[in-house]
């Protein structure tokens, strides 16, 4: 009897979203004989229609459920009968990863779902499994399963009908028990959606099947770091004789807040009131964020701040607890307490239908991670419009930085009162600070109204009275009704603007969020599909950020450039730990994109920039686990590429790193007035007597990583995606951390429109980022897919790594470092000889496996 890695649903995995529904194991076969494993890379079109003659699974669970019926689970009522019986639902799974889940139908042995799924897949498997389960207050029970062989699906024909629901003995779980379903596989190469590139001219529909549609018209400003001083980066020339303009993110935010007349809405993982957005030398007039918001609220502007409530920080009866994550949420709340600025500390709460265990996990481990600033701004004819900032920058300490990313030189100037380095114990007097690299954006156009809608949905949920507060009759009226304010341009008006300007953008807003964090999702789960939401168990999910990444990667024709704080996923295809539950498709999609291009003998390259290690002590258990998952992800991708090279006989001519490379950022800084520490006219600063070993090493080597906090991707120089979401399960599942992102392109600057490489704002942005990281620009960088460019960038990054790791301290002009692992010609990823641990701080670079089932690090 074959053992199928697909089915006892783990309690720790919530939701039922595609590539986010967790792992399941069923210890019985759903087919007789051995089946061939096939790679399914494309989409599955699935209908789960109905089941007939299901068993009554409710015994003890039935009686317990009756006692706990007041807990209120969102279900669809089934048979109108006093009989208490099973509460069935169906999960759809491949390679052990749940890719779809129906809603629960209460008290029915003949449920009718008629639920549709259109699911992207990139899995190697012998079967697609449909598991029929009985939902209970405490977990669920498997009734039986149906297996559809992938070999049959590869024929391309639709498979449909009534299929026996088999139990562990290989027989129907009850006489006549059947599941009505329909399933058809369409391979990637036959899907027109992915053949035309990412920004396919004026007719592009964006990412289909998402909560927010593609909005046409408007402007986008792209930012690298919180600030860029004029003249510090090389010039980048765009089409039409335009020179790329480097935005000043925090200064633009400060200006937008100052000029607001009606509303300022802010969301953050952390918002810290003493932060100074504008830092010009010797300018005492530039106040703090908190002071600025108070002034605006006194002017009559509605100022609402929605911040994650860190459960480990408390302020009770004068006793204060800082909190593990140092978000300063309680401090910010206290600062605004007696002002007209309204601050809501919003806990990450589990859904109504979640078990106690699941609710505890959600509230303790997961966060509200969105970072947005929404304001009204000047529009034509003396009216106002909505403008929104979206990206990776929280308005808190440690985030202000420039492309120079200093370690020591700004401790008494730009970073006075803003010292941040949580990786080891050090001080603002000694340093080094942790340099911070991030990506952000400003949306001026109809898509900004979707960012506003997200804020309103979250605020209404967070401000909903709880407990004794429910007795109050008044409802929250903090949100402005902009549809009742004539001088504010509405969404329909903003969308109908005829914008033929060649510099205009098409923009779409994406999220990772579920119905426990927003108000406005339908109450009836049957309506979920119509709103492009996915069903979890007793919850509705928007996981459109994941959908946006998959669509953009599949549509890529030339190259992918990613900067992200984390990079792990597609664990279903790892060589071990396949059941981890990091089921997002992004790493596998990139690897398969490269493999397909190799088979087609077409140029393609992927560049991925990540931090040297996740923030914190690199020797600690959580960070060692994350590094281990990252290593498994890299290994899987390189092995996939190597197999493609072997398949077409190019493995002696090329190696996997000719197509895929990982980088990190780092810098070192000699003392002022010196050339290097070995050739110094004066003695370098010495650590104080109480310095710890890591601090002593860092002060001696005068080096540190530049922390990559970015969450962005550029595809083919025509499409950009920027937001708050990391490339890990926490950010992409939709039932874990809440996230928001924007994806956009300029239709007049696309390959489809121009017939050649576009040189619009996105090209300028990517080149500007490369100029920051490499210290200069070359003409070859304009074509990242070319082998010469791939090898040149890798060569420069290897030289930079050697300079970073050397004993001699020298000033670094380039910051892009080859990620310090060795990748051989067969795609095997191992420790770099002589550099198994991180310089100065230690910790294995490829991480350590610790056998502990948890969701914190994935």
From Swiss-Prot:
Q: Name the enzyme's class.
A: hydrolase
The UniProt record lists the C2 domain at: 27-163
What is the regulation of this protein's activity?
Answer: Inhibited by neomycin. Up-regulated by PIP2 binding.
Residues the record marks as active site: 369, 371, 376, 709, 711, 716
Record-linked SUPFAM superfamilies: C2 domain (Calcium/lipid-binding domain, CaLB), Phospholipase D/nuclease
Q: Which residues carry this modification: Phosphoserine?
A: 680
pH sensitivity of activity: Optimum pH is 5.5 to 8.5.
Recorded hits in Pfam families, A to Z, give: C2 (PF00168), PLD_C (PF12357), PLDc (PF00614)
Q: Which key words are in the record?
A: Calcium, Cytoplasm, Hydrolase, Lipid degradation, Lipid metabolism, Membrane, Metal-binding, Phosphoprotein, Repeat
Per the entry, the cofactor note is: Ca(2+). Requires micromolar level (PIP2-dependent).
Q: In which tissues is it expressed?
A: Highly expressed in roots and flowers, moderately in stems, leaves and seedlings and low in siliques. Not detected in seeds.
Q: Where does a 1,2-diacyl-sn-glycero-3-phosphate bind?
A: 369, 565, 709
BP GO annotations: embryo development ending in seed dormancy; innate immune response; lipid catabolic process; membrane lipid metabolic process; phosphatidylcholine metabolic process; response to aluminum ion; response to oxidative stress
**Principal cellular location given in the protein's record:** cytoplasm
Domain PLD phosphodiesterase, chain residue ranges per copy: 364-399, 704-731
Q: How does it sit in the membrane?
A: Peripheral membrane protein
List the GO terms this entry assigns under cellular component, sorted alphabetically. cytosol; plasma membrane
Q: Which cofactor names does the annotation list?
A: Ca(2+)
Q: Which reaction does it catalyse?
A: a 1,2-diacyl-sn-glycero-3-phosphocholine + H2O = a 1,2-diacyl-sn-glycero-3-phosphate + choline + H(+)
Q: Belongs to which family?
A: Belongs to the phospholipase D family. C2-PLD subfamily.
Function text: Hydrolyzes glycerol-phospholipids at the terminal phosphodiesteric bond to generate phosphatidic acids (PA). Plays an important role in various cellular processes, including phytohormone action, vesicular trafficking, secretion, cytoskeletal arrangement, meiosis, tumor promotion, pathogenesis, membrane deterioration and senescence. Can use phosphatidylserine (PS) and phosphatidylethanolamine (PE) as substrates only in the presence of PIP2. Can use phosphatidylcholine (PC), phosphatidylglycerol (PG) or N-acylphosphatidylethanolamine (NAPE) as substrates in the presence of PE and PIP2.
**Protein's name in the database:** Phospholipase D gamma 1
* Source taxonomy: Eukaryota, Viridiplantae, Streptophyta, Embryophyta, Tracheophyta
> Gene for this protein?
PLDGAMMA1
């Amino acid at each position: 009897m074959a053992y199928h890695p697909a089915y006892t649903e783990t309690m720790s995995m919530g939701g039922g979203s595609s590539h986010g529904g967790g792992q399941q194991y069923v210890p019985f076969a759903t087919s007789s004989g051995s089946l061939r494993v096939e790679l399914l890379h494309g989409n599955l079109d699935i209908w789960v229609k109905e089941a007939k003659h299901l068993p009554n699974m409710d015994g003890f669970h039935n009686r317990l459920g009756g006692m706990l019926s007041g807990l209120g689970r969102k279900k669809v009522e089934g048979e109108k009968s006093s009989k208490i019986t099973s509460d069935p639902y169906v999960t759809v799974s491949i390679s052990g990863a749940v890719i779809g889940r129906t809603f629960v139908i209460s008290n029915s042995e003949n449920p009718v779902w008629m639920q549709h799924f259109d699911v992207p897949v990139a899995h190697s498997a012998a079967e697609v499994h449909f598991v029929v389960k009985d939902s209970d207050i405490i977990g669920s029970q498997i009734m039986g399963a149906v297996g559809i062989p992938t070999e049959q699906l590869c024929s391309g024909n639709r498979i449909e009908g009534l299929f026996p629901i088999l139990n562990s003995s290989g027989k129907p779980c009850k006489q006549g028990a059947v599941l009505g379903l329909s399933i058809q596989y369409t391979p990637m190469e036959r899907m027109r959606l992915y053949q035309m590139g990412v920004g396919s001219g004026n007719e592009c529909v964006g990412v289909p099947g998402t909560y927010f549609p593609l909005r046409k018209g408007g402007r986008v400003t792209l930012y690298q770091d919180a600030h860029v001083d004029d003249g510090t980066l090389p010039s980048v020339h765009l089409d039409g004789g335009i020179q790329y303009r480097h935005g000043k993110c925090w200064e633009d935010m400060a200006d937008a807040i100052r000029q607001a007349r009606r509303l300022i809405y802010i969301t953050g993982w952390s918002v810290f009131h003493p932060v100074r957005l504008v830092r010009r030398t010797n300018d005492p007039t530039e106040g703090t964020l908190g002071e600025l918001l108070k002034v605006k609220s006194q002017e009559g502007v509605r100022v609402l701040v929605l911040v994650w409530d860190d459960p480990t920080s408390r302020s009770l009866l004068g006793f204060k607890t800082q909190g593990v994550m140092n978000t300063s949420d309680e401090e910010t709340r206290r600062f605004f307490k007696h002002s007209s600025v309204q601050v809501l500390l919003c806990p990450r709460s589990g859904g109504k239908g979640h078990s106690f265990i699941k609710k505890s996990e959600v509230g303790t481990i997961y966060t509200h991670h969105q970072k947005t600033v929404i304001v009204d701004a000047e529009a034509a004819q003396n009216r106002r419009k909505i403008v929104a900032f979206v990206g990776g920058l929280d308005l808190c300490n440690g985030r202000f930085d420039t492309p120079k990313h200093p370690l020591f030189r700004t401790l008494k100037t730009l970073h006075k009162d803003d010292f941040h380095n949580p990786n080891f114990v050090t001080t603002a007097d000694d340093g080094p600070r942790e340099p911070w690299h991030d990506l952000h954006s400003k949306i001026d156009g109809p898509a900004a109204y979707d960012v506003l809608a997200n804020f309103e949905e979250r605020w209404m949920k967070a401000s909903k009275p709880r407990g004794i507060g429910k007795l109050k009759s008044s409802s929250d009226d903090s949100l402005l009704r902009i549809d009742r304010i004539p001088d504010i341009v509405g969404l329909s008006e903003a969308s109908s603007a005829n914008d033929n300007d060649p510099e205009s953008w098409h923009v779409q807003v994406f999220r990772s969020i579920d119905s426990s964090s927003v108000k406005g999702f339908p109450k009836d789960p049957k309506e979920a599909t119509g709103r492009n939401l996915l069903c979890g168990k007793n919850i509705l999910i928007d996981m459109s950020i994941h959908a946006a990444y998959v669509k953009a990667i599949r549509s890529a024709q030339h190259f992918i450039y990613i900067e992200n704080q984390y990079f792990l996923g597609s664990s279903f295809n790892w060589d071990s730990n396949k059941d981890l539950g990091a089921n997002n498709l992004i790493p596998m999609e990139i690897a398969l994109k490269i493999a397909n291009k190799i088979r087609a003998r077409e140029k393609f390259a992927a560049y991925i920039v990540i931090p040297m290690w996740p923030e914190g002590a690199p020797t600690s258990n959580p960070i060692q686990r994350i590094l281990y998952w990252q290593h498994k992800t890299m290994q899987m991708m390189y092995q996939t590429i190597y197999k493609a090279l072997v398949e077409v006989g190019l493995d002696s001519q090329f190696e996997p790193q000719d197509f895929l490379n990982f980088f990190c950022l780092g810098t070192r800084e000699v003392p002022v007035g010196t050339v290097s520490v070995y050739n110094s006219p004066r003695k370098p600063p010495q650590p104080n007597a109480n310095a710890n070993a890591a601090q002593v090493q860092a002060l001696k080597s005068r080096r540190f990583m530049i922390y990559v906090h970015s969450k962005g991707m550029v595809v083919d120089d025509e499409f950009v995606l920027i937001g708050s979401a990391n490339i890990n399960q926490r950010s992409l599942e939709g039932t874990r951390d809440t996230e928001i992102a924007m994806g956009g392109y300029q239709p007049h600057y696309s390959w489809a429109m121009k017939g050649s490489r576009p040189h619009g704002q996105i090209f300028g942005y990517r080149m500007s980022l490369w100029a920051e990281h490499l210290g200069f620009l070359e003409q070859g960088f304009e074509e990242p897919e070319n082998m010469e460019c791939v090898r040149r960038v890798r060569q420069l990054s290897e030289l930079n790594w050697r300079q970073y790791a050397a004993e001699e301290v020298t000033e670094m002009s380039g910051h892009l470092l080859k990620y310090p692992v060795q990748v051989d010609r067969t795609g095997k990823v191992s420790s770099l000889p002589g550099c198994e641990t991180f310089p100065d701080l230690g910790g294995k670079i490829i991480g350590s496996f610790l056998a502990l089932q948890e969701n914190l690090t994935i």
